[in-house]
Amino acid sequence: MKKTPLFEIHKELGARLIEFHGWSMPVQYTSIIEEHKAVRNQCGLFDVSHMGEILVEGPGALESLQKIVTNNVARLKKGQVLYTPMCKDDGGIIDDLLVYCLGQDKYLMVVNASNIEKDFNWVRDNSNQRTEVVNESDNYALLALQGPNSKKILEKVSSVNLDSLKFYNFTTGTLKGAEVLISRTGYTGELGYELYLSPDKAVEVWQALMEAGSDLGLIPAGLGARDTLRLEKGYCLYGNDIDENTHPLEAGLGWTVKFDKASFIGKRALLKYKEEGLSRKLVGFKLKGRGIPRHGYPIKDNGDQIGVVTSGSMSPTLSEGIGMGYVRYDKATPGESITIVVRNRAITGEVVKLPFI
């Protein structure tokens, strides 16, 4: 099993470690609810070094990326970040990822841990000959500092001017002598920063951040809280809410598909879905009774199955069962009453507009 550069720190902190896509990762340190609330109200620090980084560069890099992803990479200037799906010919989602514009003809794709090898092969095989594609995943550690106090904490240990750093923009600077790419991005819906750095500097930077945040409510946070935080904001998780059998339009990601772009992989299939209409849609829902919806639970209407839960949890913020799932398109309107089958119990739920908070 792979270990991040912070593995020993997680053990020292008493984290509960689990196997996650071939990595030993901290799912929680104290409790998911405590870590979740810290991120919403103060700050949390996550080790997400299991994520993958793929460098795409050369005179053909932009042309290759425009063909490979659905969003418009051409609009990126140096220092900007783009969220985009990457689709197959049939519109199915290979992965959802971030594209960083490092400079002219130089981009970094940040991909899900479960898909690194698959994505690397796909990007390499579908790039033109004037593009070099390199799997740089082993050369990066990735820390996510998330929560309302994240800016104050980061300013204590870095000389970078964060006032001018806008959402989905990044800059570079030094932190405890380490060269760091500081990105104003995250998976929590809070003010936050993601820090890309050399693996051999990860421990030093983690400790510096924890020390700087000691009087600002900073605590380490695991993958459990990361999941409940993203769910409350209605963010998709690859492998749960989206995969190769779902497409961006039904997943509520239509805003990332730029049909006015020249041809890209999946464009024809997605255009057909757009013209013919959707048969199902990813929705958010709340339970009206006690229970926790989980991935794979049936969604019914008058006894007929109309969909399936893709993500679900007890919301630490709302203290009620929330989830996302695909339902038949005619049942996807907020306010619709549905039934979730939780451990053979039928619990009434209601379709709601995302995000939950």
Swiss-Prot record:
The keyword Hydrolase does not apply. One of its GO terms (molecular function) is aminomethyltransferase activity. It catalyses: N(6)-[(R)-S(8)-aminomethyldihydrolipoyl]-L-lysyl-[protein] + (6S)-5,6,7,8-tetrahydrofolate = N(6)-[(R)-dihydrolipoyl]-L-lysyl-[protein] + (6R)-5,10-methylene-5,6,7,8-tetrahydrofolate + NH4(+). GO terms for biological process: glycine decarboxylation via glycine cleavage system. One of its GO terms (cellular component) is glycine cleavage complex. Pfam families: GCV_T (PF01571), GCV_T_C (PF08669). It is an enzyme of class 2 (transferase). Keywords: Aminotransferase, Transferase. Its EC number is 2.1.2.10. The glycine cleavage system is composed of four proteins: P, T, L and H. Belongs to the GcvT family. The glycine cleavage system catalyzes the degradation of glycine. This is Aminomethyltransferase. The lineage of its organism: Bacteria, Bacillati, Bacillota, Clostridia, Halanaerobiales.
